[in-house]
A protein has these predicted regions:
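Glycine-rich acyl-CoA binding loop
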Residues: 113-121
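Conserved beta-strand-loop-alpha-helix junction that forms the acyl-donor binding cleft
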Residues: 112, 137-148, 165-170
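Short hydrophobic/aromatic beta-strand or adjacent loop that forms the aromatic wall/cage
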Residues: 71, 174-178
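Short, low-complexity, intrinsically disordered N-terminal peptides in bacterial proteins
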Residues: 1-9
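Conserved acetyl-CoA-binding loop of GNAT-fold acetyltransferases
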Residues: 152-162
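Conserved GNAT acetyl-CoA-binding A-motif
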Residues: 121, 128-141
């Protein structure tokens, strides 16, 4: 029996659905994840540690991009507070419009191990298939953090690897692992 209640999941499809409180929680979550060693570093961020000043404009950009057909945010809450989140998106171009990508998968460090990321990923898969009409999802994960095993358990397959593509710190290069899930 799980001692922790399951997270409540909610899907956001438009910028106006993100309240000021949720915006602050998204920023706090991402800052905490990155500064605890999490592998969710946006291209716009400096190397860790990051601050709210670094994170806020990236969150704002993700929120502005929310659109029912192109980009959705899934949030997980526990006890009414944000516990984790991710983004599912697709490209409009006809060559790739049948597939989407999952990005920014994260849970608050203090709430890890409670099935929050699993619940988010399972819901993302259903949303992508049933609501967005996608046929395949892609994700890129940092090697050396055990993430590829997490995704494998959820049915994802490694389809490529860029050796040493991610420099986490001087002398600490990690592979970027490309994974795919057929829906």
């Amino acid at each position: 029996m799980n001692a922790h209640p399951p997270p409540q999941l909610r899907q956001l499809t438009r910028p106006d659905e993100v309240t000021p409180r949720l915006r602050e929680e998204l920023i706090d979550c991402w800052e905490a994840v990155v500064n605890s060693g999490g592998a969710v570093i946006a291209a716009e961020f400096p190397l860790p540690p990051v601050s709210r000043t670094d994170v806020a404009p990236v969150v704002d950009g993700l929120v502005r991009a929310l659109d029912p057909g192109l980009g959705r945010m899934l949030v997980a809450t526990v006890g009414g507070a944000l516990a984790g989140w991710l983004v599912v998106r697709r490209d409009r171009h006809p060559l790739v419009a049948h597939r989407g990508a999952v990005n920014h998968v994260q849970t608050l460090p203090r709430l890890r191990g409670r099935g929050i990321a699993t619940a988010l990923m399972e819901r993302a898969t259903a949303v992508a298939r049933e609501e967005m009409g996608l046929e395949r999802l892609a994700i890129a994960v940092r090697g050396g953090a055990g993430l590829e095993e997490f995704y494998r358990r959820l049915g994802w397959t490694e389809v490529g690897r860029w050796p040493g593509a991610l420099r986490v710190a001087p002398g600490d290069d990690r592979d970027e692992i490309l994974m795919s899930l057929v829906l």
